[in-house]
């Protein structure tokens, strides 16, 4: 799933994610199993989440985005500054309708 979003779908997700607050923060410990589990839970609840990479994080923002995307099975919709958006469609009850 991580790379099957079209440009139009990414644009739609970026618009929806603009007003979101970061639900997950990556700090000095980097991406731990607990953080990945928390991100997965938030994706199940919301489908689209914003993640912030703190300055103390040992990973580059792009590396962090790609690693968390791979560990959660989510699509990377956007990387902007120290934040990025992850999207994982709920197969049972989708809340976000993609174009």
Question: Where are the language model's segments positioned?
Answer:
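Positively charged, polar, low-complexity stretches
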Residues: 1-99
